[in-house]
């Protein structure tokens, strides 16, 4: 399977079309990010391994399948990534949640890491690294750097976003060609201000009602 995938499920595409609209309220935007995050998790988890286990139903003993192997961790890139967490937890309620916080240096325009709070056993977990936007790729690259420094293996990291720019995809693939990238849409380009076009605006501001 390709390391880059656009998830074209009809429900995801329909909800994304509503999410993009400038008239969407903070409440609507928040709910849609939550819902699309959950649907993306369904697609991204499609290849998780299964194992046979024996259980007892009210009628008899039987063999069923359950997810095997590594436990899961959801790691949002703050702040906008927080909006995707609850939707994923609805599908995977036992997942641990870590946080990686970034801000943009106004002089260099580069991301600066200010917070890393991860499960102690993060190196042994399958990781969904989430952020609604993949614009320049700078924050995603730095977040993957942080995970790898803590001994997370590339094959255990999946970056999940809602909208990506070609520039961000290219930058992340060049820096970390060994991780998988999933997006609901690959947009046209970045504009001169670093916004994805046509995009959906500033995801953090629209999620939290700030400017």
UniProtKB/Swiss-Prot annotation:
Gene3D superfamilies: 3.40.50.2020. Uracil binds at residues 196, 201-203. Allosterically activated by GTP. Keywords: Allosteric enzyme, Glycosyltransferase, GTP-binding, Magnesium, Nucleotide-binding, Transferase. It catalyses: UMP + diphosphate = 5-phospho-alpha-D-ribose 1-diphosphate + uracil. 5-phospho-alpha-D-ribose 1-diphosphate binds at residues 79, 104, 131-139, 202. Catalyzes the conversion of uracil and 5-phospho-alpha-D-ribose 1-diphosphate (PRPP) to UMP and diphosphate. This is Uracil phosphoribosyltransferase.
